[in-house]
Amino acid sequence: MKTKRLYCFLFTLGLIFNVACNQLSKEEQEFDALMQKVIDVHDEVMPKMGTMSSLIKDLEPKIDTTATGKSYATAQKDLKDSYDFMMDWMGDFSNKFPHGEENTTKDIEKFTAKMKMLQEEELEVKKLRDQINSSINNAKKLLEKS
């Protein structure tokens, strides 16, 4: 009977220890939540890449030397800049945060640096989202007028 209790106790203790060791720290949970926010903004604007490409093509025949034609050229340039911004951001993000890389608090200096980079990426991706949305809205308004 005592042996059975001992095994039960050791099993329970081992289970508790295993669960406790596999939990993410508060900092790691914050990192994961922030990473998800950044990815969510990316996922929001990624489908708009096709729209930007179409609008760039739609604006092309309307560009000329008149004032109206120049406004189409400006709108097209804004779309191209937004498109390039997205491509550059994705490449940069992939270099900073390679797929499959673990970001744990085991090396606190490295983790802190990664968290700071991720906070900067959150600001950058929001700027990207705003630029993409603005360039699309502007181009659509111009094309509706014509």
Region roles according to the model:
Residues 48-55, 82, 89, 131, ...:
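Amphipathic, well-ordered alpha-helical segments in soluble domains
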